[in-house]
Amino acid sequence: MDAWLKYHAAYILPIVYLCYKTGCDLKKSTRQDRKLLLDAVRDAYHMLMELSVPVRPVGDEKSLEPGFANWIVKLIIYGMARTRIGALCTTEHCRHAPGEMEDLDSAFHELCFEKPNFPMPYFNQLYSEMPSWNQIRRIYGEKT
């Protein structure tokens, strides 16, 4: 369960960062934003693999490699950004649970401190493009 939760965080956090970057309106995200999101997920997965955390679900990392599974993931990300159900699953959750998102972010960054020199350029770029957690709390409040 521990490994699954870590990989879940690795997948969710780039979505969270993009949500906050776009003011919780993923319709504002560009194709380049969504590519950056998937590259950031890949960075986070590689970090966990570097920490010897077993991939859970088994084989999930293959969905980030070129091929049919990756095409499906891109389609899901596009749907998440362009549909009401996608907004409900992502932006509404970020809007109403900023404390939870910040806690998840803090916990993941604690893991990253174990390998401080491990390169995660896309993950760090997307993180740097969102408002600070202080700004997010001011905008959305502590609705956890």
Task: State the predicted function of each range.
Residues 2-27, 32-45:
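Active-site-proximal catalytic alpha-helix in oxidoreductases
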Residues 45, 49-144:
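NAD(P)-dependent Rossmann-like dehydrogenase/reductase catalytic/cofactor-binding core
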Residues 1-2, 125:
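Short, surface-exposed recognition loops or helix-turn segments adjacent to catalytic cores
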